Amino acid sequence: MRNSSSSTPPSIKAQHRAAKRRAIRRRRIDLNCGCSIYIHIDCRNNGFTHRGTYHCASSREWRLYLGDNKSPLFQDNQRRGSPLHQHQDIPLTNQVQPQPEESIGSPQGISQLPSMDDIDDSFWENLFK
């Protein structure tokens, strides 16, 4: 039942519908491994790690889409400022920390638990009394 009072605020359903239809602004980055990453436009100049390699999502590399079929035209804007690292004579080490390989066995913190079938019935009877 609708409220006939003039003090009720207008419905925001129309605004919600428009917000749902609005496209998410994101940028596509094609990596050397063949993967494509989509980064939200507000997350520019942030980095990310993919398959053990750190990538910087700066505005140096960007993709421009043309027309309705979105054909890619790759651009690489060359930086015209000072170099990123001022001291070129100091060797820079790789800051990427390798990820440990996953093991098939049980985790280190949990020892192997006995099978529930190996526990005798008297234990369960005493437990639930």
UniProtKB/Swiss-Prot annotation:
Q: Give the motif span (Nuclear localization signal).
A: 13-28
Single GO cellular component term: host cell cytoplasm
Predominant localisation class: host cell
- Compartmental location: Host nucleus; Host cytoplasm
Q: Where are the zinc fingers (unnamed)?
A: 33-50
Q: What does this protein do?
A: Strong activator of the late viral genes promoters. Enhances the expression of the capsid protein and nuclear shuttle protein. Acts as a suppressor of RNA-mediated gene silencing, also known as post-transcriptional gene silencing (PTGS), a mechanism of plant viral defense that limits the accumulation of viral RNAs. Suppresses the host RNA silencing by inhibiting adenosine kinase (ADK), a kinase involved in a general methylation pathway.
What this protein is called in its record is Transcriptional activator protein
Please name the source species: Tomato golden mosaic virus (strain Yellow vein) (TGMV)
